[in-house]
Amino acid sequence: RSVSRGLGDVYKRQVSVSLILSGFCSLGVQAHPVQENSSGDPVPAGAYYTDNYRNLFNEYLGISQQQTDRKIEQIWNHFFVNEKTKVYYESDDNTAYIYDTGNQDVRTEGMSYGMMICVQLDKQAEFDKLWRWAKKYMLYTSGKWSGYYAWHCTPHGVKIGKEPSCASDGEIYFITSLFFASHRWGNDGAYDYNQEAQKILKDVMSKDGSQGVYNLFNTESKLVTFVPEKVYYNYTDPSYNLPAFFELWALWSDTNKEFWKQTPDAARRLLADASHKKTGLFPDYSAFDGTPWKPKNWGYDTRRYQFDALRCAMNVGMDYYWFGKDAANQTEMMSRLLNFFKQDNFTHEYFNVDGSAPAGNYSTGMIGANAVGAFALNDKDLAKECIQKLWDEPLPTGKFRYYSGMVYMMSMLHVSGNFRIIK
């Protein structure tokens, strides 16, 4: 992983992670009309309605379920068990954290990805230890930030930075993984997972801005904020927009249900607007109309496709195969994006959104996220190429294995049919 990723991390927050090997029972299947994509071809109803999760490794490459399961287990051992390559570390107080090996800190990004991985893989003990660490060390329990989580801490649990701050994607993955935990394990153990999720959902929408801290979502645009304070409240990070998760919040939240019902389509519009009309590339940060945006005096050019932006393909692909409500737009977006990378011979990592000024080397995280984006492709040859690249990619090692590794890990779960809506 390039050194520049590590430097960029100082100014933003990222991560990706989640796993699962076993099937899940649903509480029922709902009817859903068949969608059509831009070519007029029917799109299978989303997995939320059918409980059918496709293994693209099997479909495109002929890889057996046994081979797939074995690979997922290897990835779990690599990142959660092996002393030389893991990013999961346990502490003496019955807690655990996901370690950003490049920046040598602990982020809500990684903690929430780790929890999602654990609930998907039925690893309750590890899930509880991660959540215990997050609540003990990251949660603000008083003051204007009360209810939010500090976006990064030292491995010893000390919040970093002079001023409190959160990173919105951490709360988003916390909430969704806690809902899944509630549905998978019940609420009678160490935690009432449902109430934990409901509390965060309520807390992050209880800030009126009078003390300088706002709601996690901008109440006018219905979009998740980059950070719920100052000017950042009026901007977003396209990769924080997870319409598939927000669909579930609208169903499961006890509070603000009418508001949450408006957020999935707002997120879908933002992703469509932020995707460049020729290249499909997304910026790291954007205005609410999708225009690339860079905060004043920021440490790098966030108008480029660089660090956070690679996750957008994963968000789009997940929404496509979970719900399929914006199939035509999502097929077009992923066709533009993945054809652009193919024309670049899958060579570079960073670009201006118009495709100019390429730099870096095509990364493991990009390989993963783009394979998830391939769910939305009509071009089966291109989809197969992206999926083959993911299967063949070596497990990330070294100092910068955390970010690319977590995106890679979640992507493997998605593409293998193991990243599921646990109802």
Predicted regions span which residues?
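Extended ligand-binding clefts on enzyme/binding-domain cores
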Residues: 36-74, 81, 104-108, 143-150, ...
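Bacterial N-terminal signal peptides
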Residues: 15-23
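Aromatic-rich carbohydrate-recognition surfaces in CAZymes
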Residues: 104-111, 160-185
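Short, small-residue-biased leader/transition segments that mark boundaries at the very start
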Residues: 1-11
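Internal amphipathic alpha-helical repeat/solenoid segments
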Residues: 72-110, 119-163
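C-terminal functional modules
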Residues: 351, 355-423
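Sec-dependent signal peptide cleavage junction
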Residues: 24-33
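Short glycine/serine- and small hydrophobic-enriched flexible loop segments
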Residues: 2, 115-122, 173-184, 244-248, ...
